[in-house]
Amino acid sequence: HLSTRRQRQMCIRDRLSTHNKGIPSFHYMVAMAGGHDIKCAKYATFGTRELSKNILRALKGRKACLIANHGQIAFEESLSKAFELAEEVENISLQYITSLKLGKPKILSINEMKKVLSKAKNYKRG
């Protein structure tokens, strides 16, 4: 059931954010968030300037990040694209947590991620 799957994905993402963990470049699709990794913004109380500053720091050069003990944020040129990106972050979170069950995943090099980021500018799904 789709809503059950979505709830599981959100739960996985929240596990990463509650541990203040970002997502390294274990998979090339991490680049869809705009960087070589997906950072996790430091925790601050909701609705505060401190939280806003922490999120902006984590988003620098990126389009999405996790937010410690909150969840995630994603932005794009349209609302529908922002939702697609948020879904991709959910999927990547699930893949990362799953891969950790087998041990530490192989991390792609910065040079490889630069290549991926360059190609990602023109990437269209579907």
Name every feature range the model reports, one short phrase each.
Residues 13-46:
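Class I SAM-dependent methyltransferase SAM-binding "motif I" and its flanking Rossmann-like core
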Residues 54, 61-126:
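A conserved C-terminal secondary-structure "cap"
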Residues 4, 34, 58-60:
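Short, structurally constrained coil/turn elements
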Residues 19, 41-48, 65, 75-79:
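Short capping loops/turns at secondary-structure boundaries
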Residues 9, 19, 69-70:
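Beta-hairpin (beta-strand-turn-beta-strand) motif
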Residues 43-59:
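Active-site glycine-rich loop that binds ribose-phosphate moieties when present
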Residues 8, 36-37, 63:
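A generic secondary-structure signal marking the coil-to-beta-strand transition
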Residues 1-12:
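Single conserved hydrophobic/aromatic residue that forms the stacking wall/gate
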